Amino acid sequence: EFGTGGLRGIMGAGTNRMNIYTVGAATQGLSNYLNKCFAGKKDISVVVGHDCRNNSDKFAKISADIFSANGIKVYLFDDLRPTPEVSFAIRHFGCQSGINITASHNPREYNGYKAYWDDGAQVLAPHDTAIIDEVNKVTVTDIKFNGNKDLIQIIGKEVDKVYLDMV
């Protein structure tokens, strides 16, 4: 279940597990919220990062496809990155939001989906509950899995350099 900060759970089949459908619903709900919240903005953008856990890169790519299918520009890291760099990249690119696929300190059978706002911090009130409401409205048939490759920009070493210079 999507809660404050995102999702976290054991990977596997079912609505109470981390899989392409629960990650897809979370991303579709966040996309819906961003499109409502920033309806007057010409370009909405997000950063997508991930860690080294099983399926993290897969969940990141699926999320990038869903964001882009909803008209949202995606800055997708080319490989795993630490959470602080994902937060930095959100601010660096002037994005409205971002996600990081990571289960942090949890055991290896877990994965997670952390949502961040435009300041690079985890989503807080009132956005957290509004995003949860949007995620809870999503059905499997609502999820737009067919990405728009023109809206996905792969990022990597160029961001690493700026990030490391700032630390």
Cite the ranges covered by each PLM segment:
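Ferredoxin-reductase
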Residues: 39-118
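Glycine-rich loops and low-complexity Gly/Arg-rich segments
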Residues: 26-28, 71-74, 100-102, 123-127, ...
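Gly/Ser/Thr-enriched, mixed-charge loops and adjacent short helices
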Residues: 111-167
